[in-house]
């Protein structure tokens, strides 16, 4: 409040005179009105109070009754308070709490209204999930088979960063021929999709490194485990930006290139089980399954406000990743079942389970414009073991089921946040196995 009149009009002093016209050695200054200050709330409050919306009257907010104010006096940016703690959080609604009747695009988020205020419209999280399966049971002599296949298709149905390491469009090796560095020597075998890093953002004259996905390379093409070494070679990480100085224009200019649509994931999951008798009182069984599960929505939802904060130098704490893939579990089991008598049976089995693409925190070290931590499909785990089960059917007043499992488990984390402290350490490529 009053931000537009905090400064004094030093170019137009007001002299003080007594009744006889004698100068009193005192100069005072009126408030200087700054029309460039964002001031939606200030302007609307002045209008509600009957003041000139562009006037210099000083308003004491604490002196007014709360009923004087309303939420629609604010702009979206004023309530989002980018660079500090937000006053509102929303998606599927506008910042005033009105439900959206259409699905806004990314351009609607960066677009402005008739007063020039950013709309900041954020659509609801509406992933598209489809699945289908076919299964058949049949016997062949003494063999009993249960065979099927399931197909899952997951589409997060939202925008994702085109490159999680660079917020703005950057040149790749394949683009160099049309740039000022067309004569640069590129190491043999370097992918055309590798992002180029240079010595200067505004006037690059040399290449200092490359990055292909999450793999970094020196200017000579050698794999670099620590991207900080590439950053140090140029006094800070400097991707070869297509629009130098774009930081002053922000993502509102580059949104169409900085983001892309989520690529749907299609998973084919075969499932096979069979069993056959060894004798009249014993049988052998086995199965093989692949299962998939969708990402946690709280870790997967696209929130464009996140990238506004990154542009302002705020990397948050743990950021959601709209580009997460489904998690996969592969399960094997073989076993033997023996009838002990007409009322009891014993089951012995061995199992192996492998889990891939599980959620874990990932440090995007030397991302541009700021290093940040997000969730990724990084974790894996394996478990194997044996199970002994005994079943006693009701005999008199006794019925019993007992089992014992011996399991050995290894993994890179016990939960999505178990690696957060390591990610915060700023050290790239640190992984560990538990236990």
Please report, for each region that a protein language model flagged, where it lies by residue.
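Gram-negative outer-membrane beta-barrel transporters
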Residues: 347-435
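Flexible, surface-exposed loop regions and adjacent strand-edge segments
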Residues: 2, 162-172, 177, 255, ...
């Amino acid at each position: 409040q009053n931000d537009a009149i905090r400064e004094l009009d030093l170019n137009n002093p007001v002299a003080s005179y007594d009744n006889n016209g004698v100068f009193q050695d005192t100069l005072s200054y009126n408030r200087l009105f700054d029309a460039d200050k964002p001031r939606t709330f200030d302007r609307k409050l002045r209008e509600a109070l009957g003041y000139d919306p562009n006037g210099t009257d000083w308003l004491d907010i604490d002196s007014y009754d709360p009923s004087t104010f309303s939420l629609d006096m604010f702009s979206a940016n004023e309530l989002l308070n980018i660079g500090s703690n937000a006053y509102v959080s929303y998606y599927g609604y506008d910042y005033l709490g009105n439900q959206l009747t259409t699905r806004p695009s990314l351009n609607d988020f960066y677009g402005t209204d008739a007063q020039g205020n950013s709309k900041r419209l954020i659509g609801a999280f509406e992933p598209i999930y489809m699945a289908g399966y076919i299964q058949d049971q049949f016997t062949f002599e003494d063999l009993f088979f249960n065979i099927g296949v399931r197909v899952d298709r997951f589409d997060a149905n939202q925008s994702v960063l085109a490159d999680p390491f660079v917020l703005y469009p950057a040149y790749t090796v394949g683009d160099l021929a049309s740039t000022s560095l067309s004569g640069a020597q590129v190491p043999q075998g370097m992918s055309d999709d590798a992002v180029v890093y240079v010595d200067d953002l505004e006037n690059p004259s040399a290449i200092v490194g490359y990055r292909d996905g999450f793999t970094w390379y020196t200017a000579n093409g050698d794999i670099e485990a620590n991207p900080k070494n590439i950053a140090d070679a140029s006094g800070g990480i400097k991707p070869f930006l297509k629009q130098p100085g774009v930081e002053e224009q922000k993502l509102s200019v580059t949104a169409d290139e900085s983001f892309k649509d989520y690529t749907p994931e299609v998973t084919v999951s075969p499932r096979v089980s069979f069993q056959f008798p060894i004798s009249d009182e014993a049988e052998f069984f086995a199965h093989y399954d692949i299962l998939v599960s969708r990402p946690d929505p709280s870790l997967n939802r696209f929130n464009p406000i996140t990238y506004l904060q990154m542009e302002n130098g705020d990397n948050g704490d743990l950021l959601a990743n709209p580009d997460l893939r489904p998690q996969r579990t592969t399960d094997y089991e073989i076993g033997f079942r023996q009838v002990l008598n007409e009322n009891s049976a014993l089951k012995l089995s061995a199992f192996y389970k492998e889990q891939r693409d599980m959620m874990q925190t990932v440090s995007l070290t030397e991302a541009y414009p700021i290093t940040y931590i997000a969730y990724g499909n990084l974790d894996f785990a394996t478990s194997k073991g044996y199970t002994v089960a005994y079943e006693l059917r009701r005999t008199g007043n006794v019925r019993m089921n007992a089992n014992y499992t011996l399991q050995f488990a290894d993994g890179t984390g016990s939960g999505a946040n178990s690696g957060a402290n390591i990610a915060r350490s700023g050290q790239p490529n640190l992984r560990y196995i538990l236990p």
